[in-house]
Amino acid sequence: MKEIIRNLVRLDVRSDVDENSKKTQELVEKLPHEVLELYKNVGGEIYITDKRLTQHEELSDSSHKDMFIVSSEGKSFPLREHFVFAKGGKEPSLIIHAEDYASHLSSVEVYYELGKAIIRDTFPLNQKELGNPKFINAINEVNQQKEGKGVNAKADEDGRDLLFGKELKKNLEHGQLVDLDLISGNLSEFQHVFAKSFALYYEPHYKEALKSYAPALFNYMLELDQMRFKEISDDVKEKNKNVLDFKWYTRKAESWGVQTFKNWKENLTISEKDIITGYTGSKYDPINEYLRKYDGEIIPNIGGDLDKKSKKALEKIENQIKNLDAALQKSKITENLIVYRRVSELQFGKKYEDYNLRQNGIINEEKVMELESNFKGQTFIQHNYMSTSLVQDPHQSYSNDRYPILLEITIPEGVHGAYIADMSEYPGQYEMLINRGYTFKYDKFSIVKPTREEDKGKEYLKVNLSIYLGNLNREK
């Protein structure tokens, strides 16, 4: 536990408030180490500060200055007057004001914000847990609780009053069944239920209230605490042994990319550096157009019939390709890695206006079955360079909101490619550039329902690809 705390918690306090920082840290230390490991695994950081929250570096930008947040009790507060906040997104962090936390109500708020961070920002809980039948069944039991027996039984609202937010109580009638579609359409409301249950379970003075008024959600949290948090954490560790996958988390991805490819970058020539930067700007289009047109080959004297100006432009592109090849041949990816790429229906030779895979946020299942039937197990040679990202949907220009298909690509150790974001004109895309000439195989097609706010309520088609190993050692 000490090592996890040391790697996860950052102290930003003066020496005269050190006692309060210790008491604040003790709140965190009471949680299962598996919970903290899951948060750390996605690049999450916990800051304990004696500053006003909006003065902390994580929250000092203008978007947080006048923000209002909602407490576990549904009350709205200006962020600048509150004492804890879980910042979500691709670089999650929890900022806690250093206090003695003698008030149990304050402790509940700290655990509530951490519970939000766990269910909203932490993989795989943020993708799967709200759709877990155990969670759904527990919600339904609480929503169907009754006082008394038989015909005289009446609705027991205690569990709903304790855990459901105002909007959920208004939209979900007592006794109404909850299903995955309802959860997908009301993500923040059900994240609140999880976070509130989490907070009451781990704050000792409120644990009994959760058990008395919402026994099904108490038992759900009990199972998570005693068994499933550990199982989930162990599963993540095991998968990370086999393949590196940063999901949406940019802080960890950027750190790995910069450190792993630092020596490679230092050994590039000026011409190689220039073309990498140029490729991330306007040069990628003519380069890849040339490679697609000639199936990845540089054809001698191909511009023989062109005028002098056109011939010179063609030779320039060919030299750029040679420099880019030389740069990427110097680099090999050091471990099995998952990268991401958003595409349109054109990936499968379909035009949007003719095919329209997604309508009103819903993926057409029949068209997915058609694509799977035609392409699963098939291979294709990527004659041009492939731009991918270390993280899913790093920028709104390439996101689920615009492109209905996500390629999740497994890159085996030894493939020629490099992290080029710190050399790019668009560093926020966290680009991994994969060398040309590899053969890719379509492995799996699956429809993903929206489980995160970033999905904009839209389903998308996830297509798993891998590099065909028989082609791994192909040299240019």
From Swiss-Prot:
Enzyme class, spelled out: transferase
Domain TR mART core: 242-470
Alphabetically ordered keywords of this record: Glycosyltransferase, NAD, Nucleotide-binding, Nucleotidyltransferase, Plasmid, Secreted, Toxin, Transferase, Virulence
Listed result of changing residue 431 to A: Restores 15% growth in yeast
Main location: secreted
Pfam families, alphabetized: ADPrib_exo_Tox, ATLF
NCBIfam families: ADPRT_certhrax
GO cellular component: extracellular region
Molecular function GO terms recorded: glycosyltransferase activity; metal ion binding; metallopeptidase activity; nucleotide binding; nucleotidyltransferase activity; toxin activity
Subcellular compartments: Secreted
InterPro entries assigned: ADP-ribosyltransferase (IPR003540), Anthrax_toxin_lethal/edema (IPR003541), Anthrax_toxin_lethal/edema_N/C (IPR014781), ATLF-like_dom (IPR047568), MetalloPept_cat_dom_sf (IPR024079)
EC number annotated for this UniProt entry: 2.4.2.-
Claim: Isomerase is one of the keywords in the record: no
Domain ATLF-like, chain residue ranges per copy: 2-226
Source superkingdom: Bacteria
Annotated source species: Bacillus cereus
UniProt entry tagged with the keyword Lipid biosynthesis: no
PROSITE patterns documented for this protein: ATLF, TR_MART
Name of the protein described by the UniProt record: Putative ADP-ribosyltransferase Certhrax
Coiled coil, from the record: none
Binding, NAD(+): 280-292, 341-344, 382-384, 398, 431
Reported function: A probable mono(ADP-ribosyl)transferase; it is not known which residue is targeted for ADP-ribosylation. Upon expression in yeast cells causes cell death.
Annotated active site: 341, 387, 398, 431
GO BP terms, alphabetized: symbiont-mediated killing of host cell
